[in-house]
UniProtKB/Swiss-Prot annotation:
Protein origin, superkingdom: Eukaryota
Residues recorded as bearing N6-acetyllysine in the entry: 92, 166
Residues binding Zn(2+) 2: 104, 106
Glycosylation: residue positions: 41, 170
Segments forming domain sHSP: 56-164
Protein name per Swiss-Prot or TrEMBL: Alpha-crystallin B chain
Main location group: cytoplasm
GO CC terms, sorted: cytoplasm; extracellular region; lysosome; nucleus; protein-containing complex
Keywords: Acetylation, Chaperone, Cytoplasm, Eye lens protein, Glycoprotein, Lysosome, Metal-binding, Methylation, Nucleus, Phosphoprotein, Secreted, Zinc
Sites where the protein binds Zn(2+) 1: 83, 111, 119
Xref: InterPro entries: A-crystallin/Hsp20_dom, ACD_alphaB-crystallin, Alpha-crystallin/HSP_16, Alpha-crystallin/sHSP_animal, Alpha-crystallin_N, HSP20-like_chaperone
GO molecular function, one term: structural constituent of eye lens
Residue ranges, annotated region (Disordered): 142-175
Gene that encodes the chain: CRYAB
Amino acid sequence: MDIAIHHPWIRRPFFPFHSPSRLFDQFFGEHLLESDLFPTSTSLSPFYLRPPSFLRAPSWFDTGLSEMRLEKDRFSVNLDVKHFSPEELKVKVLGDVIEVHGKHEERQDEHGFISREFHRKYRVPADVDPLTITSSLSSDGVLTVNGPRKQVSGPERTIPITREEKPAVTAAPKK
């Protein structure tokens, strides 16, 4: 008995290119984007390939991901937690690690029942005092964790460059 082997990188005319190849590649509980409602690539043109869903370019907020920034004067983390209430979130600092945990029990939504849980850890930069870290939750579900960076002590000083007449590297003696 022959078994057909389907390679995900080979385009097949009767198989939509954008379909998830594994169960975990699907976006459960997330809203549809407008591009999800377009016809499949093979019905448009045999030469047109719509990019797969993981290559879409929505804003970071729509993806459920986090963004960590290290700016001149502060360290910050923005994390999309729109599916969690403030009571379902915990932010802790353990040594030089920030831990964010969110969990809600099973509840019913328009698609059925769903429960969610996540753990995220971020290393605090060496120039940020863990005791100064704060967090806030915006009305649109973005958790912001930030802390000020320590300023370098002392004024800036320009160091003059002197020129020497001898080379820095000397040739090795030949044998």
